């Protein structure tokens, strides 16, 4: 007969077994534990304040949705931002989940359609789409946030994402990325402050929180996602986590303590305004306008 484990803090049946710290928790005490963990992380890194106007990026998946949910419960002033990328099947399901989330949270939802801005969808892009998609999402959410008076952008990147990212950049010795990897990116010119409230939270815990709170999200994945290397990294890290519970967090903590070792001296760099859209750019034309060839449209409109 299998023994039913009880919650550490009450007599209810356990909902989850935490590996680090080792304890069983019922659904109610797990939700309390999770939300306190997020609050501590926000306070630790001075991520957010209650008077800030916060734009939460939601793609339809559990991480962004859980981020919005917990911030609303903690009393922050949030609104949701979603980009319809025009990917058959995926975009429809994502938008449906996002609308349901906004309705449950009773917060404003802002939806931007990629085709309305570029005249194209991600389906129209040939070859590898992921890097262009990343550039597109970062640009559009920052531009929308800047033009609509938001103070900060929150994304749902979690501990597993961060550790995998750091590991990948260590393998490739991308020093510049390693030097700038932070839970909070400060505002600069037209770049809004960006925050990762799940920087220290495992993906597994986010999933269990989403299930416990019955947060609406879609499990449909993008058919173009390039995840081969990332999945291998995660599988390796998950095996290590089984053998040494807490190793992911220890790895991230070690990186945060020693990230100054990756700092490199850089020449004084002056950002400028993109000649096409006017947003902050490293060059004459920003990466978004360049990849979507919007500079060509501007020339055509002049003629």
Swiss-Prot record:
Catalyzes the ATP-dependent 2-thiolation of 5-methyluridine residue at position 54 in the T loop of tRNAs, leading to 5-methyl-2-thiouridine (m(5)s(2)U or s(2)T). This modification allows thermal stabilization of tRNAs in thermophilic microorganisms, and is required for cell growth at high temperatures. It catalyses: 5-methyluridine(54) in tRNA + hydrogen sulfide + ATP = 5-methyl-2-thiouridine(54) in tRNA + AMP + diphosphate. One of its GO terms (biological process) is tRNA wobble position uridine thiolation. The keyword Zinc applies. GO terms for cellular component: cytosolic tRNA wobble base thiouridylase complex. Zn(2+) 2 binds at residues 274, 277, 286, 289. Zn(2+) 1 binds at residues 7, 10, 26, 29. It comes from the Archaea. [4Fe-4S] cluster binds at residues 130, 133, 222. ATP binds at residues 57, 83, 137, 156. This is tRNA-5-methyluridine(54) 2-sulfurtransferase. Its EC number is 2.8.1.-. Keywords: 4Fe-4S, ATP-binding, Iron, Iron-sulfur, Magnesium, Metal-binding, Nucleotide-binding, RNA-binding, Transferase, tRNA processing, tRNA-binding, Zinc.
